[in-house]
Every structure is written in C-alpha cells, then in structure tokens.
Amino acid sequence: MKKILFIIGSLRKESFNKKLAKEVEEMLARRATVEYLDYSDVPLMNQDIEFPAPEAVKRVRGKVAEADALWIFSPEYNYSYPGHLKNLIDWLSRPLVAGDRQTPLSINGKKVALSGAGGASATTKCREKLTELLTLPFIKADVMTEPQTGIQLNMEAWTEGRMMLTDAQKENLRLQVDAFLEYIG
C-alpha cells in the first residue's frame, strides 16, 4: 500500500483544509496509508542555521523522503499560498550538505496532489502558484495538474466554522483520489 503524506497549509486547529484532508483520508481508506506532516516547529529559513540543519527540518525531510507521494491541502492567502507553507518548501529545496547541489533532495521527483478550501476563488491562485513553485528546476516535484479540487466555502462555513461539502464537491474529490492513486502507481 502506498504511503501518502498530507501537508496542511493552515496551522489553525479547526482548519477547513484539515477537514478537507480528513474527507480525503476517508476516501483513501484501505487503498493507501495516510500520515499528516507536523511542521509547526520548523524555523524560518535562515542560512545562518542551515548546516547542520535544525532537528525539525531533518524530521520533515525524513518524512517527505519516506512517503511515496504528497498531498497538499492549502487555503489561499492574498492570491497565493501561506508563508509557513512556503517556508517548509524552502527548507525542502535546500541542499542537505553545504555546497552539494548533486545529491537529490527528498522532494525531487515526489508526486504531489493539490487541493484547497477557501473563498470565492476556491484556491485557484494558490494551487497555480504551488504548481509553479514545486516544478521549479531545483525542486522538481511531479505535480498532478489535473484533476485538482478547489472548494469554495459557503457563508455558513465562515460564520459557523463547519464545512459541508456538496455531493458534486465530494464527487470531485473522489475523482481526484482515484486519479492520484493511478498517478502514483
């Protein structure tokens, strides 16, 4: 069974994207193993502390390396991705040894699915920018560009803190789950 590492772009305890990930986890039951990446303790990228890498950075790099694939669930912040998610990707894109640009990074070639729950744009810009970032020549992740799922949250979600997916949204997620399982082989 394939191991998929879920990365939630929001660190909020009651994150809609964490709830979206839980929906996908249920759809993946008995088809893949799911683990959630805790990167809340990863420090801001700073070359002064890059070598040796902080323990939290070593841990997340190890988790990414162990996974067969990644699934990122992210909100959209100002037409892009959250800063702490970018910080994680910055750390994953850095060499493991000072001056060594030859050793592959844990994220190189990693198959990635993208989904998000948010406002009116349904995280379209966030997913576009993440695809652009993750496919840079030195990151070289293998992003599945179609299908992706963007959920436009209804007003009740924002006022009551509950995310209720429509049947159509659930079906879009199911299609993405099936496609991603095929994509990662």
Where in this protein do the model-derived segments appear?
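Hydrophobic/aromatic residues located in beta-strands of well-ordered beta-sheets
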Residues: 4, 34, 112, 142-143
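Short hydrophobic segments within beta-strands
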Residues: 7-9, 37, 115
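A generic structural motif
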Residues: 29-36, 139-141
